[in-house]
Amino acid sequence: MSKVFKLHSDFQPGGDQPEAIRQLQEGLEDGLAHQTLLGVTGSGKTFTVANVIANLNRPTMVLAPNKTLAAQLYSEMKDFFPENSVEYFVSYYDYYQPEAYVPSSDTFIEKDASVNEHIEQMRLSATKALLERRDVIVVASVSAIYGLGDPDSYLKMMLHLTNGMMIDQRSILRRLAELQYTRNDQAFQRGTFRVRGEVIDIFPAESDEHALRVELFDDEVERLSLFDPLTGQVQYHVPRYTVYPKTHYVTPRERIIQAMEAIKIELEQRRKVLLANGKLLEEQRITQRTQFDLEMMNELGYCSGIENYSRYLSGRTEGEPPPTLFDYLPADGLLVVDESHVTIPQIGGMYRGDRSRKETLVEYGFRMPSALDNRPLRFEEFEALAPQTIYISATPGKYELEKSSGDVVEQVVRPTGLLDPEVEVRPVATQVDDLLSEIRIRAVKNERVLVTTLTKRMAEDLTEYLEEHGERVRYLHSDIDTVERVEIIRDLRLGEFDVLVGINLLREGLDMPEVSLVAILDADKEGFLRSERSLIQTIGRAARNLHGKAILYGDKITDSMAKAIGETERRRAKQQIFNEKHGIVPKGLNKKINDILQIGQPAGGKRKGRGKAVATAETFSNLSAKELESKIRELEAKMYQHAQDLEFEQAASVRDQVQALREQFIANF
């Protein structure tokens, strides 16, 4: 029997959770294709879904609207299911400039990208888990609707090794090269292998913990062992092991040869069309580029931009949807769309933007028409591929409500008894000075403040103004990358600063119980950022705190403001009635602060290295000035010793601790 989900939690479902779990579970068992969970901020929507997954025991994909929320959900699901496979699948690009052509200035922009190795490994781990086991939860961003390698080709390319298997060393090395692994006898890293006599060490592309040692004797696999790639220490022996390809885009040799023939036929057809229209430059361009790609595919089995030939490599017909992560999800899988009011429109918009750019490339001879099939799913294709779906939002959109026939599962009462924030409207004229006084009240109580503005310029000016008045403030904007954004939110929770200013980045799903005040500047300016849905979501950021409050600065109450305030008061009234009926006293949340992906930074701003965690400054908070000085000297000696031994990560870790102790010394003595 396949492994089942085992939910770990110190809490039992409370508030509206038991009823929501029952309704969602019954709906799925009855075969309902679409259900909507209207869950207010802090009502434990993730815990509700975790219970449904555990009860039904079905592989699940959770779609989030961005990497930050996906990282938060991944962290929470890992806490709930430590014994099961919880995976993370988002775009692995830290930076991505797609191939593009600007006809007006005759400018061709080459594709340029920076790949995050850690996220690439997590993506490979996600598809491996879906292929190997049933107890899988994959937390994904909208990256899940983009083309991925064909699962059939991916499965065919695997290298299966078992003890006692008859295979010579040269055959294993040839197969590893086909899987796009490279030989590197000096630097042993992910996606490489090394050879020492009759021993082959392979560092699997999807692993960050184990490497495989294959010991051969007379063309027979004598022993398979998993070992620590850093220390070389063997951890345990295994009877069999499957080596997965280094990339999702790997293709069997026979399929590549078939694809090359089809590409040649299309090239000839395209050349005729371009010549017939007098496009000599475009004809020369497409011929040169395609012939170079064909040469590379023939010699190496792949080429730069091979995804543009995905129609032929996956054996699909023109216009057919590309293979995506949905093709790896079993037929009885479950789809959970988090913050659906944002995620669903995103899915619909991806195809159109991609298509417009590629049509220009095709028209001017940079790509052949088949490149148009290297694309994200169209919305109707997504609908056809999606299994049974639960939409989750505090403010469900029109689409979700229609799909679930207006029958919504409500989760308004929180297990903690916390009420929705009090909402107050104040005049715009004094908004900045009024905000400053409110921030100071919160800072004294060690509480945090979120401020949302309408423009980037105003956010920058406000941040500068607050800094000049001695407030500890940071500004969250769209230029900040995913990892740094996670770290800023973590630093806010840790109390590194008190105020976070942003524009449209503080709305959905950011889980910060320390935030007791949300200030919405210029709330009476109707528009996308001040719509009913946006206001409800932003107000909800203060709903995880016992003293939660939202201040809307506006000179008039717009329709959106009236609806948002009315809905917040409706929910607050329902929560109060439930609390009084059941004798519940609201309790603040005490949520632990995790390093969401284990790729963030600890407070203090420096990344942790491998090895043991160092003690924090709090460990030495009771030391006298003399003892503290002695401790700093001791740690400095330790730091220099690590550096002398070339253990730079440990040295950096101790350096951070020394810095924290020095700050403590200055503050206290």
From Swiss-Prot:
A motif (Beta-hairpin) lies at residues 92-115. ATP binds at G39, V40, T41, G42, S43, G44, K45, T46. It is found in: Cytoplasm. Residues 629-664 form the UVR domain. Residues 431-597 form the Helicase C-terminal domain. InterPro entries: Helicase/UvrB_N (IPR006935), Helicase_ATP-bd (IPR014001), Helicase_C-like (IPR001650), P-loop_NTPase (IPR027417), UVR_dom (IPR001943), UVR_dom_sf (IPR036876), UvrB (IPR004807), UvrB_inter (IPR041471). The keyword Ribonucleoprotein does not apply. GO terms for biological process: nucleotide-excision repair; SOS response. Pfam families: Helicase_C (PF00271), ResIII (PF04851), UVR (PF02151), UvrB (PF12344), UvrB_inter (PF17757). SMART domains: DEXDc, HELICc. Transmembrane segments: none annotated. It comes from the Bacteria. Its main location: cytoplasm. Forms a heterotetramer with UvrA during the search for lesions. Interacts with UvrC in an incision complex. NCBIfam families: PRK05298.1, uvrb. Belongs to the UvrB family. The UvrABC repair system catalyzes the recognition and processing of DNA lesions. A damage recognition complex composed of 2 UvrA and 2 UvrB subunits scans DNA for abnormalities. Upon binding of the UvrA(2)B(2) complex to a putative damaged site, the DNA wraps around one UvrB monomer. DNA wrap is dependent on ATP binding by UvrB and probably causes local melting of the DNA helix, facilitating insertion of UvrB beta-hairpin between the DNA strands. Then UvrB probes one DNA strand for the presence of a lesion. This is UvrABC system protein B. It comes from Photorhabdus laumondii subsp. laumondii (strain DSM 15139 / CIP 105565 / TT01) (Photorhabdus luminescens subsp. laumondii).
